[in-house]
C-alpha cells in the first residue's frame, strides 16, 4: 500500500470566474423587488381594512367618553352643563363628529358647546344616521346621575340610535348602535 506524501503536494486553484453574472444579479434583484411589492400591497390592503374597525371603535370610545364625563360630573367652562355631555353626528359633515357639553340643556349641539372635534380615519365616512328612520343629524347626550340617555334628532327623542360607517376604498360597512340604557355596540 502506497501512502502519498501530503506535505509536498501542491494544490492548484483553477482560475475560473467565481463571481455573479449580470443575469444572476438581475434575477436576484427581480425576486427581491417582487417580494417587496407583494408585502407592501398586502400591508396597505390590511391597513385600509382596519381603518373601518378603528373608526367604529374610536366612535364608540368617544360615546363612552361623553357618558363618563356625565357620570363623573365633569365641568365645562367652570360649571356642569345643564344637558350633560353628548356626541353630535351629521350627514353634512361625514368625516368627523363632535363631543360637546350641552350647556343650554336643549339636547342639541351648538358650536359654542363644542369640546372636541374627532376626525374619522382616512377613507371612512358616515353614510347614514337613524333613530328608527333616516336622519340628517343625531345628538346623543348623557345626563347624570343615572345617566339618562337622550337620542335626539332635532325634533324628538328615540330609544335607539344608529350611526352607519363605510370604507370608501373597500366598500365594507359598520354600524355603531346606542340604546336608551347607554349600551354602545359596534357591529
Ranges and model annotations:
Residues 81-144:
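Type IV pilin-like appendage domain
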Residues 170-187:
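Low-complexity, S/T/G/P-rich flexible repeat/linker segments used as non-globular hinges
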Residues 104, 146-154:
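Long, compositionally biased, intrinsically disordered regions
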Residues 17-44:
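N-terminal single-pass transmembrane signal-anchor helix
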Residues 47-79:
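Membrane-proximal N-terminal amphipathic helix
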Residues 1-20:
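N-terminal leader/signal peptides at the extreme start of proteins
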Residues 158-167:
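Short conserved beta-strand and strand-loop elements enriched in small hydrophobics
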Amino acid at each position: 500500500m502506497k501512502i502519498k506524501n501530503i506535505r509536498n503536494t501542491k494544490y492548484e486553484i483553477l482560475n475560473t470566474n467565481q463571481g455573479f453574472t449580470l443575469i444572476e444579479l438581475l434575477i436576484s434583484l427581480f425576486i427581491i423587488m417582487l417580494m417587496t411589492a407583494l408585502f407592501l400591497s398586502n400591508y396597505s390592503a390590511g391597513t385600509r381594512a382596519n381603518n373601518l374597525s378603528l373608526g367604529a371603535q374610536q366612535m364608540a370610545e368617544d360615546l363612552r367618553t361623553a357618558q363618563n364625563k356625565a357620570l363623573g360630573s365633569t365641568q365645562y367652562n367652570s360649571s356642569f352643563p345643564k344637558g350633560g355631555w353628548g356626541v353630535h353626528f351629521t350627514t353634512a359633515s361625514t368625516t368627523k363628529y363632535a363631543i360637546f357639553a350641552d350647556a343650554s340643556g336643549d339636547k342639541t349641539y351648538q358650536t359654542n358647546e363644542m369640546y372636541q372635534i374627532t376626525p374619522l380615519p382616512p377613507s371612512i365616512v358616515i353614510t347614514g344616521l337613524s333613530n328608527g328612520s333616516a336622519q340628517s343629524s343625531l345628538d346623543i347626550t348623557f345626563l347624570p346621575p343615572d345617566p339618562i340617555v337622550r337620542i335626539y334628532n332635532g325634533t324628538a327623542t328615540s330609544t335607539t340610535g344608529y350611526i352607519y360607517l363605510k370604507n370608501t376604498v373597500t366598500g365594507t360597512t359598520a354600524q355603531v348602535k346606542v340604546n336608551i340604557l347607554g349600551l354602545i355596540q359596534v357591529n
